[in-house]
């Protein structure tokens, strides 16, 4: 009997839960050991808070006010072989005059090339996690009838070291990992995750103005192109075994030409 693989939750869900806990502690002056969050796919998760720390206003010793709160949630990727499994995702929140300001801190990448989910200069916190985080802040502010604003900074202390093992440097995301997730759940051994990455790379090449793209199942074809023809690998995309799906994406994105290269045995398999 085949073992059912265990699902996990995304870095976006970790950031969402850590933010909810931190804002609750900031505005409610309470301790929080765990939080329950609703995910975009309507699932509900209860996650433990791995770390929590309050910082007080040191200039008001007679009646110290909480200046900021930092909470962390530990990432659980389930049975998916994800390098981010077990890392701590932190959210530090503080009061501001108005609005909700969200940014990335240590270990969260910064976008340096066009064509990605976020504009150049933004922290690599994708749209859905941003929405999840802002939703939690808004709801907690409403709960405590807080009329001011909140600043949220998401950090991943291990993020900069881990980023070298991801697609981020190739995509132009510098300094850390991305805060990701569309459903909030990590599906183990997901083909969709790899297809999504291929789509992001192709969209980026198109946004940079390239009309011709080289694709290859792996390193063999790309190294051949570089060694034999001096081809710029910044204009290429690895497609693994998803050659057909990648060709469909190339067509949909409006590239005028595509070059497919690879080991003959791999291509005809």
Please provide the spans of the model-predicted regions.
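Generic N-terminal targeting/processing segments that precede catalytic cores or assembly contacts
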Residues: 1-165, 169-171
